[in-house]
Amino acid sequence: LKKYFLLFVLACASFMAKAQSGFNYYEWGVGFGASYGRGFDDLNRQVWHPGGGLNLTYNYSPYVPMSLEFQFGTLEGGGRTPDKDQFGRYSKNNYKALVLHADLQLGEIIDYDNSGFLNVIKNFYGGAGIGAISNSMKDIQRTNLYLFNGPDTYVFPGKSKSVNLMVPLRFGYEFKIYDDYDQVGYTITLGYQHSYTFGEGLDGYNDNTQKFKNNAPDQFAMFTIGFKYNFGNTVSYTKLVRNFR
């Protein structure tokens, strides 16, 4: 009798585990990424540069990741010749940023259960966050190079090192890779991030608005690709995450 009872318990456990297959997700994730970005600041000419990032993610749900991310890269603009900048201004900023952001994927708000199309688009996301960026000018032209603009003793105002508050806006798509437990073990993300900063630190210049174009907050943008490994506690979701059809 004990033998049959044990078999019954094991069968029930197996059935319940199978019933939950595809509904579960991991609570945490850790990842890294690469980026390709440029600035939108007081200097018209901008140079694209590669960058990178590391992140720790709390998965509030399979479709709402909340991440603390360390980002780094280079923002370069202007030039010391008139064809690149009228005043010979040039800066190269090796920046570092710490950002807290959250993304909302369509799968959180749509019913995709019986639609192959919706199962594909459920991984599109939009998000926002808040953080701080540390600006450090590796190279910057502080004095006027051309006398037709004024005396060569003129010093362009600004700081070579500064910290600014930043707000990133994020858009993209996440490819989910499932493990042997039918949970999202890994993700690959393709995205775009546009960040607004509160201050004039990205290019190191804080010029007089009456003489120079300086009518918008400094901004920078990047295209990103990221990889994330999920781990930790297994949590059950209200909808089927994996489509078995």
Predicted regions and their residues:
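Short glycine/proline- and aromatic-enriched beta-strand/turn motifs that initiate or cap beta-hairpins
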Residues: 19-59, 228
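Short loop/turn motifs that connect adjacent beta-strands in outer-membrane beta-barrel proteins
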Residues: 20-27, 63, 108-122, 177-186, ...
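Residues that define the transmembrane beta-barrel architecture of outer-membrane proteins
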Residues: 26, 46-52, 94-98, 122, ...
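Residues on the lipid-exposed face of transmembrane beta-strands in outer-membrane beta-barrel proteins
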Residues: 32-36, 54-58, 100-104, 128-132, ...
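Structural signature of outer-membrane beta-barrel domains
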Residues: 37-39, 73-77, 107, 131-137, ...
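Extracellular loop and loop/strand-boundary signature of outer-membrane beta-barrel proteins
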Residues: 38-42, 83-95, 114, 152-159, ...
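Gram-negative (and chloroplast) outer-membrane scaffold detector with strong preference
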Residues: 64-150
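Predominantly the C-terminal beta-signal and adjacent terminal strand-loop region
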Residues: 176-245
